[in-house]
Amino acid sequence: MNCESLLTALDVSTLLSTLSSPEKEHRRKRRRGEVANPSNTLDALVARKADDQPFEKRYLSEQEAIEGPDDEIEMKKMELDPDVSTRTCSTCGYQGKWVSEMIRHKRVHTSERPFKCRYCSRTSKWKADLIRHVAKTHGIRVVSKYSRSKVFDATNSSMDSSCSSDSDRCIISEKRTVFYRCQLCSFEDERVSVLNSHVSHLHNTSPCVCRCGAKFEDVQGALAHSNGPCSHVDMIYNVMPTYEKASPLSPCRSESSSDSGIQTDPEEEASIITSSLPTPQLGSSPLLLSPTLPVTPSFLPDIQSALLSLQPNPLMSLYLASLLQSSLLNSPTIPTSFPQIIPTTILTPSQQDEMVDVEM
């Protein structure tokens, strides 16, 4: 009995160790940094802290969230500090590969804290520490110029091309014509997989949501659902592509719903329509009132205001103007200031008799 119980205990311990080995392996990889903790990322910290803030306030640039050192001061340090120029620390013997690495390392031996938070009194020696502090404490995601994420309304035109005046080589970054944008905030990326993960983890929803409550992770499932019990009008797409104006794929001048994410400029549309239509000249058409003709007080006020409101409008229909003039001709109160409408020739009795003889 003792041997059997011992074997049973060994089997149970072996089984437990076998079952717990994947979890131990996962913990080991997380400690070594091989596996990222999704609840400890910057996006997760922002989503956990900034529940009451609007989404457009969560993504800011480095200059808007962090106050950094002056660039001229940093350049003087690189020129005057021998440790930076030789890439070797004279205090501890640390050797670095880059100038920026040596500048960051020199702050370890000094009390310099050049980075300051713009929302509190927190200071730090390194920028990465302040970026994490702003995300964890204030719920703001700092988007740097080297990060993969991009703010939709941020204009970083200076980072589009890097041209050197001393050399003939000019490296121009080619922009992709299609990006993907989150409709719930201002996050944008060129990969749809990043946007799908962003919507799922940050906003706790799916890329495609139906008004009936159904959620879909891809467009194919949403289209199949819209062809069945629900219509395509009921679908809300939280991830939509955005196009540049020069792109042939850009659906410019196309009408879309508020959930599509593709917006057009109404002023540009109106200018295109008005430029394509002929503009009528005042006084050139007999259906329009000439501005030089006097208007007598016997003219009806409501008709007068209607004509004055229609006259300078370039999009007025001539058919409406003809109907309005015909109503004036049939009206008993006709002004005497329109010679083209009221005949001014008065026939004598003899002429009237001649006309009667001709008609007879």
UniProtKB/Swiss-Prot annotation:
Tissue localization of expression is: Expressed in pharyngeal epithelium/arcade, which connects the pharynx to the mouth.
The molecular function terms in GO held by this entry are: DNA-binding transcription factor activity; RNA polymerase II cis-regulatory region sequence-specific DNA binding; zinc ion binding
- Disrupted-gene phenotype: RNAi-mediated knockdown causes an increase in fat-5 gene expression in the pharynx. Pharynx unattached (Pun) phenotype.
Q: Where is this region: Disordered?
A: 19-41, 248-272
Q: Which domain of life is it from?
A: Eukaryota
Q: Which UniProt keywords apply?
A: Metal-binding, Repeat, Transcription, Transcription regulation, Zinc, Zinc-finger
* Matching InterPro entries: Znf_C2H2_sf, Znf_C2H2_type
One biological process GO term for this chain?
Answer: negative regulation of transcription by RNA polymerase II
Zn finger regions (C2H2-type) covering which residues?
87-109, 115-138, 180-203
Write down the SUPFAM superfamilies for this protein, in alphabetical order.
beta-beta-alpha zinc fingers
Cleaved signal peptide residues: none
- Regions of biased composition (Low complexity) lie at 248-260
Main function: Transcription factor. Represses gene expression, probably via binding to DNA consensus sequence 5'-[AT][CT]TTCC[AC][AG]-3' in promoter regions. May play a role in pharynx morphogenesis.
UniProt-recorded name of the protein: Zinc finger protein ztf-2
What is the organism of origin for this protein?
Caenorhabditis elegans
